[in-house]
Curated annotation (Swiss-Prot):
SUPFAM superfamilies: PDZ domain-like (SSF50156)
Biased composition annotated in UniProt, kind: Polar residues: 244-260
Gene3D superfamilies xref list: 2.30.42.10
Protein's name according to its UniProt entry: PDZ domain-containing protein MAGIX
Amino acid sequence: MEPRTGDAADPRGSRGGRGPSPLAGPSARQLLARLDARPLAARAAVDVAALVRRAGATLRLRRKEAVSVLDSADIEVTDSRLPHATIVDHRPQHRWLETCNAPPQLIQGKARSAPKPSQASGHFSVELVRGYAGFGLTLGGGRDVAGDTPLAVRGLLKDGPAQRCGRLEVGDLVLHINGESTQGLTHAQAVERIRAGGPQLHLVIRRPLETHPGKPRGVGEPRKGVVPSWPDRSPDPGGPEVTGSRSSSTSLVQHPPSRTTLKKTRGSPEPSPEAAADGPTVSPPERRAEDPNDQIPGSPGPWLVPSEERLSRALGVRGAAQLAQEMAAGRRRH
């Protein structure tokens, strides 16, 4: 730096306005109020350092009476061409961002966890480091509790070391505290043992089997207390028995016997082939469906087939017996 007063150049450069002034010697508390006609009271140290480096190797200082300015922290500016230059950057802020985004193993005052628990034993260890609010967990149980309840984790403080550890859950059983067994300890003794351990806490945890999801129920396994219902109360349309029953019922309604059929069958007790084709018939599957021992659930039978006489009366057609009587009466008359 070259001061305009003509004195020897100060090899230290300008340190926050502490260089020689035209009217007096160096001052211990001298504020740098303006730089390049810009007020510096509300500027950050990084901005001031950038302005000074932009000014080059020459920095002109002018003394001014003290005014009411913001009493900020000392700002040290060093010429970047000097051997031991101080370069101000955003590294503190960068480190803070790294801390926020870092995994739990790198956060200060966090939990340092041990290796992952063994799947076979279910035991694992966790090491916690005390934070500003403690270890961040609450314990419950102990010998003094009714029934001698085992010591277990009852709660995790939000953003506490125990929660940031990511391995503790509510309901985990605490087997050891700082290498000593918790069997037979009261709740007060367990808390005292944690306090006596200092800023670090080493726990051996066992996760109860009840917290693990159980075996899924089979697809075809019925539930207890539930009576299995039939999948379909209606008869199987593909079965021969019900198919015959349906065809017989349909033929009774839609295909009444004709007079010619009745005339052809009046002389024989057995129906003729023509009558079997036109009139209602009972097929072997129908007879099988009429079996009283048939216990198939949902079957509509047994079917009742009306006699020829009743069918003739219902349809208003003369029966075979009536036709035979009329024929006999006609012969007698002749």
